Amino acid sequence: MKTAALAPLFFLPSALATTVYLAGDSTMAKNGGGSGTNGWGEYLASYLSATVVNDAVAGRSARSYTREGRFENIADVVTAGDYVIVEFGHNDGGSLSTDNGRTDCSGTGAEVCYSVYDGVNETILTFPAYLENAAKLFTAKGAKVILSSQTPNNPWETGTFVNSPTRFVEYAELAAEVAGVEYVDHWSYVDSIYETLGNATVNSYFPIDHTHTSPAGAEVVAEAFLKAVVCTGTSLKSVLTTTSFEGTCL
């Protein structure tokens, strides 16, 4: 009597069943700002025992990402134990007097502004409010949320190192505190490694302007994010495949 051979069973480690979703702008997105640049989100998967879904979109702010339903789209598919990393700031400034659809309402709390954009009346929230609302969407699904400060523009652009954080760095930290989620000071960790690398190297990372990085630069920016994760003990550390990254803890 022949017995059927049992196929071997393979089980994925629990970390591999975890998904990390990214929400951001061109500095995080695939193909960055175009012309051969790339966003740092494209390099995270190399260091994680988790699936990475890069939902960053060029040209977006916290406001426009919200208006287009992109946070909702992530919330529709995220499951308990997944991560969502949110990083905006580059496109959130400007004036509402000539509304470009991206500028947030000025302030740090529940302030609201009103505008007509693309023929539609819009109630505009502050930058922290958009991030807090997004965080609540994801935590309600059991996801682990990390609010990250934006990356710096080229601090060596003038030939002299200049560290000048935008207000959105502080706002991201405030939003994380109010929402009760984790915060990564990506700005400071990128700035620190840029200062160490020096003028010539860092300038080579910005082939088209002072904002968008080359693939090599984007990988440095990704590693700086993970250095911050390791140094601050952020929960994402549990799915890292290495904890050895250049730079010092701040």
Curated annotation (Swiss-Prot):
EC number, UniProt record: 3.1.1.86
Disulfide bonds: 105-113, 231-249
Top-rank taxon: Eukaryota
Coiled coil regions, renumbered to chain: none
InterPro entries: GDSL, RhgT-like, SGNH_hydro_sf
UniProt cross-references to CDD domains, sorted A to Z: Rhamnogalacturan_acetylesterase_like
Name of this protein: Rhamnogalacturonan acetylesterase
Organism, scientific name: Aspergillus aculeatus
